Amino acid sequence: MFLLRLIIIISVYVSTGAYTLYTSNPVKSKWLVEKSSTISIAGSTNVNRFCCQVNEYTGPDTITLNPAGVSFLGTLSVNIEDFNCNNRIMTGEFKKTLKYHEYPRLKIQFISLERMPSFGAASESVKGYVEVELAGICRKFEVTYSACRKNEENVELVGYRVFGFSDFGLVPPHKMGGLIRVNDKLDVQFRLQLHQINQ
């Protein structure tokens, strides 16, 4: 009698779809980070705001999405020399503050997502974790993403996070005897254009 009840319970469990998560065979997808991808770091001084950008991503990097473990794997490696703040003096101070001679690259390692986005035509918000390496210091952050599909083979993934110079042991620059001071807070955004390379 107990065995019969157990068989009935298992049958109902499977027929209602509760078993789908374990029997489904999600396929990993691999995505190329296209050159049109950008990364920006915006901040402010006691006088005005500034924004330093890399307007063309030159790394041949790929990102892997795995629905089975909701993993989001890959690393962006950005040459700090490529940042442009649209002001020669500000650009130089920005790079100097990031110690680009000693640590020439900013690295963003993707770790996980809270859930897999559907990548539909409408923008969808999802959170995840990344590890940022800057000036020789690594920090783990939660990032808010906006994901949408551009066409059959291309998606856009925009990540946003606020952190500070101090998170990486850096001191914000100041000029003119301290009359112009850069605030600690930075708004970081990476806008990734991703092209699927496996079908």
Located regions from the model:
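Low-complexity, acidic/polar, glycine-enriched regions of mature
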Residues: 19-199
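Bacterial Sec-dependent N-terminal signal peptides
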Residues: 1-31
